[in-house]
Amino acid sequence: MAKVNGETLDIMIEQSDQPTFKDYVTLAKMGIVRANLITVFAGYVVAASYLTDDVLLYLWQTKLTLLWTLLGSGLVIAGSCYLNNYIDRDIDYKMERTMGRPSVTGKMDGQRILALGLGILATGTVLLLIVNHVAAVFGLIGSFVYVVIYTMWLKRTHTINTVVGGISGAVPPIIGFAAVTPTLHIDAWILFLIMFVWQPPHFLALAMRRTEEYRAAGIPMLPVVNGFAITKRQIVWWIAVLLPSSLLLAHYGIIYMLVMAVLGGYWLYMGLKGLKIKEEQAEIKWASKMFFFSLFYFTAWIVTVVLVSL
């Protein structure tokens, strides 16, 4: 076996500590990027359906615009997530879910993360400007809400952090819509409304599952500050608002209405059942079911919106 001297060993250790491609991807929070790009695409398809009866042909004819829209949006979102990781370094190490991030372990220093975040965000904004200024403006609005209002301010100070932060998650369908027509149709705002109202029950259920982690990090999530009973009532209230909100797109047809009525009705039923649960572990189990159903609801809604628009 070849000998390894001290200098060689130091180099090997130093190289092993260098950030990998996976580390860069981790900081971009690709799960968030993918989910938001799905809604960007949905907004694009919905807007296209108002311009032509052959949406598939339109998508092909405008494939470059769609590409710049998706790429620009993805970079804006990824850059914002980099900035979120940079800002949250001081609390992420306290949470099991986030303590392994390169921003926490030291594999990437803060200055590099900050520079990359700003650079990626700027690049995405330029690409959206190539599409049109309205899409770019909404991209920046979403980034500002997520990075400044949510991450730097409300996440650390108030239980409404999830609600206000939801504005950033509701902006992507408007970006997609604006990429087709800068003059926004009322449906663009309804898509925004549905996405905005969907997020509180989704993230509050997640917060219930991760209550002790948030408590350890000093993040004032609703279940940490006010307990499970109030959080469950809030979840049910938001779902009750979501149900009629989703039906505002009644002109999408009977199939859309049936799908959303059944999904929303069942989710509300699940929520109401949870109000009767008093034992903590059972409440956490209920929260897990609510969280995963929220993902199913989101997926089914997007698929339905796209299919009825084609």
Curated annotation (Swiss-Prot):
<dbReference type="GO" id="GO:0048034">
    <property type="term" value="P:heme O biosynthetic process"/>
</dbReference>
<dbReference type="Pfam" id="PF01040">
    <property type="entry name" value="UbiA"/>
</dbReference>
<dbReference type="InterPro" id="IPR044878">
    <property type="entry name" value="UbiA_sf"/>
</dbReference>
<dbReference type="InterPro" id="IPR000537">
    <property type="entry name" value="UbiA_prenyltransferase"/>
</dbReference>
<feature type="transmembrane region" description="Helical">
    <location>
        <begin position="113"/>
        <end position="133"/>
    </location>
</feature>
<dbReference type="InterPro" id="IPR006369">
    <property type="entry name" value="Protohaem_IX_farnesylTrfase"/>
</dbReference>
<dbReference type="GO" id="GO:0005886">
    <property type="term" value="C:plasma membrane"/>
</dbReference>
<keyword id="KW-1133">Transmembrane helix</keyword>
<keyword id="KW-0812">Transmembrane</keyword>
<comment type="similarity">
    <text>Belongs to the UbiA prenyltransferase family. Protoheme IX farnesyltransferase subfamily.</text>
</comment>
<feature type="transmembrane region" description="Helical">
    <location>
        <begin position="290"/>
        <end position="310"/>
    </location>
</feature>
<protein>
    <recommendedName>
        <fullName>Protoheme IX farnesyltransferase</fullName>
        <ecNumber>2.5.1.141</ecNumber>
    </recommendedName>
</protein>
<comment type="subunit">
    <text>Interacts with CtaA.</text>
</comment>
<keyword id="KW-1003">Cell membrane</keyword>
<comment type="pathway">
    <text>Porphyrin-containing compound metabolism; heme O biosynthesis; heme O from protoheme: step 1/1.</text>
</comment>
<feature type="transmembrane region" description="Helical">
    <location>
        <begin position="215"/>
        <end position="237"/>
    </location>
</feature>
<comment type="function">
    <text>Converts heme B (protoheme IX) to heme O by substitution of the vinyl group on carbon 2 of heme B porphyrin ring with a hydroxyethyl farnesyl side group.</text>
</comment>
<feature type="transmembrane region" description="Helical">
    <location>
        <begin position="257"/>
        <end position="277"/>
    </location>
</feature>
<feature type="transmembrane region" description="Helical">
    <location>
        <begin position="64"/>
        <end position="84"/>
    </location>
</feature>
<feature type="transmembrane region" description="Helical">
    <location>
        <begin position="186"/>
        <end position="208"/>
    </location>
</feature>
<feature type="transmembrane region" description="Helical">
    <location>
        <begin position="37"/>
        <end position="57"/>
    </location>
</feature>
<keyword id="KW-0350">Heme biosynthesis</keyword>
<keyword id="KW-0472">Membrane</keyword>
<dbReference type="InterPro" id="IPR030470">
    <property type="entry name" value="UbiA_prenylTrfase_CS"/>
</dbReference>
<feature type="transmembrane region" description="Helical">
    <location>
        <begin position="134"/>
        <end position="154"/>
    </location>
</feature>
<feature type="transmembrane region" description="Helical">
    <location>
        <begin position="159"/>
        <end position="181"/>
    </location>
</feature>
<keyword id="KW-0808">Transferase</keyword>
<dbReference type="GO" id="GO:0008495">
    <property type="term" value="F:protoheme IX farnesyltransferase activity"/>
</dbReference>
